[in-house]
Design a protein with these regions (language model features):
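Active-site cleft segment of glycoside hydrolase catalytic domains centered on the general acid/base Glu
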Residues: 149-155, 185-221
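A generic "cationic amphipathic patch" detector
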Residues: 96, 104, 140, 147, ...
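Solvent-exposed loop/turn segments at secondary-structure junctions
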Residues: 97-100, 141-143, 185-188, 232-233, ...
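Substrate-binding groove of N-acetylhexosamine-processing glycoside hydrolases
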Residues: 2-27, 31-33, 72, 171, ...
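Flexible domain-boundary/linker segments
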Residues: 100, 108, 144, 151, ...
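Generic signal for short, ordered secondary-structure residues
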Residues: 62, 106, 148, 197, ...
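Feature activates predominantly on carbohydrate-active enzymes
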Residues: 1-184, 219
Length: 601
């Protein structure tokens, strides 16, 4: 039996709440994430930007803690002023778990939650006073040791517990307009907190049941439930973001004025070269598109990685989908990287801010990219807007053709329930230069000369960008950093697509050494990690081809071999390898984010 934290509402009260939800069901929703200020003072080499670093927030009240909260509120005020001025009408923050009290939590943790509730109430007011509706993220499901023990003893289901938790939470925080539910990804290995989220929704039917149990609570309190379809590919639910039948199993026939579906624009993470997700056209439920303006795989705003023309194409296509009511702009969230520019606050975050401004003008107002860039240049007091537009066109070209390898990026590849990312050599803040990457690229790329010519042209474009920067009124140092970083990629491409010689190894090692000297580890500008090695990869090209043809497919639908072998037997094989031969699995793959093992669940 589900317990509630308040008495029943009157029929007239429920009717008025239902009316409120229905009235705003199709109202535009333009969300932006506001977690940046909470990373102040988070001094680690690689930052987990996936959520607020709760373990570093003040746990007591003293002068230092008060100064920290004052700084956060000052930053949030600056952020909210800018977001509201640009036209956003909602923000996302982390998270329900750290603000919802419950009797089953550890006593010392409840004391800390009481402190967080008091401080976040002040933070929420900053947004609501400026017309920005507050939405809080929530992973399903997050445990503490004591909570897990109590739920096990009481045989309490996750859905039942969450429904009770939200019922009380909504009463405590009437200023919170809704929740943003994530079921397909949980805390990574870099999260060190008493609360730990884990994946508990494994089947489409479980996701649907979760919605059926939580939506009535949201309707009762007139709050939105924004349900994210993003997953990392684990379990049967792992293809929710792109598989039409899984998507239909979860959402078909659902009718609730509280429900909004949130989908990333593509069938993978925030990469280029991805077609628009066709699930936008498969339901009339209100939905928003997720867009990232601090591109976690493309430098995080350390250099221009302009998204304007990319998002303009998606916006054009989305006009033909029913009930797309807005967008969720991730301007800070995402990635395990050393880069630390904070959007809408730091003056150095100009490239993130530019992407964010242009994205909203495209998605909300239907502007063309060039007009949006000119408006941003005028607002920020930059230089020649035409020079800036030219610079951004070159940047778009360089990112697409040198950060990515175009011929590989254009290929549609699936492994198990995941669409393979179109980027192979760069991952977050790491550049991989080694023989295994070389062999893979030479297998997938059939026109290496074109790739080499493209790299040379891009290096010329970077010099043109540096020359344009003073006229455009943007930081020359950012463009020089981009040239130095992409110069390593151009040299790596030469290594990848030509025969190996000792001379190319020497040039690469010298280039890496010079890069590290120019951008020291604890210097003012974070650098990429160059993971370099020239040990020959033992697998012959022919066997690589066999492995690719066996394990990967070039269409969305599953093959017979996928259903018989890849989705089931391969999981068992991986578990045996992880147990008996853990050294076969690269350390980076094991320790990054949730770890590669999640793909094999």
């Amino acid at each position: 039996m589900r317990t509630t934290l308040q008495g029943p509402r009157s029929r007239s009260s429920l009717a008025s709440y239902a009316g409120l939800l229905h009235s705003r069901r199709l109202q535009p929703l333009h969300l932006i994430d506001a977690i940046g200020p909470f990373f102040r003072g988070h001094d680690v080499r690689t930052i987990n930007w996936s959520k607020i670093p709760w373990q570093n927030l003040p746990k007591t009240r003293d002068a230092a803690a008060e100064a920290w909260w004052v700084q956060v509120r000052d930053d949030l005020t600056k952020f909210a002023d800018q977001a509201a001025a640009w036209g956003f009408n909602a923000v996302s923050l982390d998270d329900v778990t750290h603000l919802a009290d419950h009797a089953w939590l550890e006593p010392e943790l409840r004391e800390r939650i009481a402190l967080y509730r008091e401080e976040f109430t002040r933070c929420f007011a900053i947004f609501t006073e400026r017309g920005l509706a507050v939405h809080l993220t929530m992973d399903v499901m997050t445990y503490t040791p004591e909570l897990r023990r109590r739920m096990t003893e009481a045989k309490r289901s996750v859905n039942d517990y969450l429904a009770e938790l939200l019922d009380g939470f909504f009463v405590s925080f009437p200023q919170v307009a809704g929740i943003i539910v994530r079921i397909g990804e949980s805390d990574g290995k870099g999260v060190h907190d008493e609360f730990r989220s884990e994946l508990v929704i494994q089947k489409p039917a479980q996701a649907r049941r979760l919605l059926l149990d939580l939506l009535p609570v949201c309707e009762k309190h007139a709050r939105r439930l924004i349900f994210r379809t993003w997953t990392v590919g684990a379990y049967r639910i792992g293809d929710l973001m792109w598989h039409r039948r899984t998507f239909a199993s979860v959402f078909e026939g659902l009718q609730s004025p509280a429900l909004v579906i949130s989908m990333k624009y593509g069938e993978s993470d925030f990469f280029r070269y991805l077609p628009l997700n066709r699930n936008f056209f498969r339901t009339s439920i209100p939905k928003i598109v997720e867009l990232q303006t601090r591109r976690e795989y493309e430098g995080c705003g350390e250099y221009p990685s302009f998204t304007g023309w990319e998002y303009e194409r998606y916006a054009r296509e989305l006009k033909h989908a029913d009930n797309v009511i807005g967008c969720m702009v991730w301007c800070q969230t995402g990635g395990w990287v050393p880069f630390r520019r904070i959007a809408l606050i730091d003056s150095e975050a100009i490239w993130i801010d530019l992407n964010t401004f242009v994205t909203l003008r495209i998605m909300k107002d239907g502007w063309v990219v060039e007009d949006a860039v000119r408006a941003f240049a005028q607002e920020r007091g930059l230089g020649d807007a035409n020079a800036l537009i030219e610079l951004l066109r070159y940047s778009d070209e360089v990112v697409r053709e040198l950060l990515y390898v175009e011929e590989f990026a254009q290929q549609k590849l699936f492994f198990r329930r995941v669409r393979i990312p179109p980027m192979l050599q760069v991952y977050w803040g790491n550049i991989f230069i080694n023989h295994s990457v070389k062999k893979l690229l030479r297998y997938f790329v059939h026109e290496p000369e074109a790739a080499l010519h493209s790299a040379a042209r891009c290096m010329g474009r970077l010099e043109q960008m540096i020359a344009l920067a003073p006229r455009a009124g943007v930081p020359v140092a950012d463009l020089e950093y981009m040239r130095d970083t992409f110069g390593l990629l151009a040299l790596a491409r030469e290594y990848n697509f030509t025969e190996f010689t000792p001379e190319i190894e020497t040039r690469l090692r010298e280039a890496k050494r010079a890069y590290k000297v120019k951008y020291p580890k604890r210097g003012l500008r974070a650098r990429y990690r160059i993971k370099m090695g020239f040990q020959p990869f033992w697998l012959h090209r022919r066997y690589i081809g066999w492995a690719v043809e066996l394990l990967m497919r070039r269409r969305r639908g599953y093959r017979i071999i996928d259903r018989l072998l890849i989705l089931h037997v391969l999981s068992m094989i991986y578990r045996v390898i992880a147990l008996r031969k853990p050294h076969w699995i690269p350390g980076f793959a094991k320790e990054s984010a949730m770890g590669v093992d999640v793909v094999f669940r």
